[in-house]
Amino acid sequence: MRVISGQVMEYISGRIYDKRKDKRILVALDEFASIGHFEVLSPFRKFRKNGANICILTQSLADIDLVYSEKERRVILDNSAYIVVLSANDSSTRQYFSELVGREQGHDKRGNEKREFAVQPEEWKEFTNHLVVIHAGGYVKLKKNFYFK
């Protein structure tokens, strides 16, 4: 799998993309961490101009941290136009996503204004029927549409 992934990345890196005649390529890397460490940061930064997008799928950010460093994982996520979160069990992952989504103005029980996470860290592990899409303009909470139901 690693050899094939590497060859695809190399092909796209050298590809001369003409948006008038060439089709865009979507590279979906499921169980991303299981592929092992390879140079993904450079392709992530420049694949869009080569007519390609990378979709990294993983069960946990901790899986990526085991293969890449936490800093490399942050660079990967920072270069992602969209992040889709189905759920998160790890407390540091939940905190990270809550910080990424940001805070909203709210009120406490006495009516005083306060800023709270738009999505509380505990909520991430309770997503059974919803998902969150994080993008440059903010976030959106969507209902999951199960094909098998």
Annotate each language-model stretch with its function.
Residues E116-K125:
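A short, acidic, amphipathic alpha-helical segment used as a generic capping/interface helix at domain edges
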